[in-house]
Every structure is written in structure tokens, then in C-alpha cells.
Design a protein with these regions (language model features):
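A domain-level signal for the structural core that forms small-molecule/cofactor-binding pockets
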Residues: 1-142
Length: 142
């Protein structure tokens, strides 16, 4: 249900750090939104450190684009901005000015995961009951 695309300077994060960040982002999102962790996706993409600019000047920040279903209030969106950012800084030792995080909301009916159309915001309980078997299959696959 959520996709966090983390764009980082090439060779700036080792595998253990990526694992810790993915786990932290997943756990924050799952706790704030109250969804199973299997519906949180995190991907890391490395970019050439000389290819990123801010204000026309070279910059080597880490950029996180979080895509999630629309409908969450400003308090929830605020938590989804501040908590992953704080986790990132805690895991990496980076300072807040070294990370840029934005959220992109999409209509749930424009989203699909594991072959299932996703529920509209507020309809998760009914949807979960209707897809118990598929969700169990996803959990068993890891």
C-alpha cells in the first residue's frame, strides 16, 4: 500500500544500513497507518553524487519519495514525514539537512498490490476480511 523510494548517493549506504533503514521505515509506516508490514515497500536507488543539484548547486542529499493512499489527515502525514526522517538520521548519523522527504498521495483505486486492488481509505477492515487468504499467502512468501 505504500512505496518509499530512497534515492541515495552511490556507495553511501552499505547493505546493513539499507536493511536497518528499510526496517525502520516499514515499522514507522505500519505503526502510524495501522497496516501490516507486508504492505510497506522500500526501494533504494543509487545516483551519481555529481548528478544532484539544489538551487543550481551540487548537493548529495538522500531523497525519500513516499507514495501512499490518499485520505490521511495532516497529523498522520506529519508523522509520516517526521518519524521516518528521524529514523533515517538515527540509523545513518546524517543531519536533517542531509535528507529530503516528500509524500505523494494517490487514490487507492489507482493502486494494486500482489494482484489485489487496494481499498479506499477507511474501507481497510472489510477489504482485509475479503482478502484473508491472499494476505496470508503474502505473509508466507515473505
Amino acid at each position: 500500500m505504500a512505496l518509499y523510494q530512497c534515492h541515495v548517493p552511490a556507495r553511501s549506504l552499505d547493505a546493513d544500513t539499507r536493511n536497518a533503514l528499510a526496517e525502520a521505515i516499514t515499522n514507522v509506516h505500519a505503526a502510524v497507518i495501522n497496516v501490516p508490514t507486508i504492505f510497506v515497500n522500500v526501494v533504494f536507488t543509487e545516483y551519481d553524487p555529481t548528478a544532484f543539484y539544489t538551487g543550481g548547486r551540487p548537493n548529495s542529499v538522500s531523497v525519500i519519495n513516499g507514495t501512499l493512499r490518499a485520505g490521511h489527515d495532516s497529523t498522520v502525514r506529519g508523522e509520516l514525514l517526521t518519524k521516518p526522517s528521524a529514523s533515517w538520521c538515527s540509523v545513518t548519523g546524517h543531519q536533517p539537512h542531509q535528507i529530503s522527504l516528500c509524500l505523494n498521495e494517490v487514490d487507492a483505486t489507482d493502486s494494486m498490490e500482489a494482484g489485489m486492488m487496494l481499498p479506499s481509505f477507511g474501507e481497510e477492515a472489510v477489504w482485509t476480511r475479503q482478502h484473508t487468504r491472499e494476505i496470508g499467502d503474502m505473509r508466507s512468501r515473505g
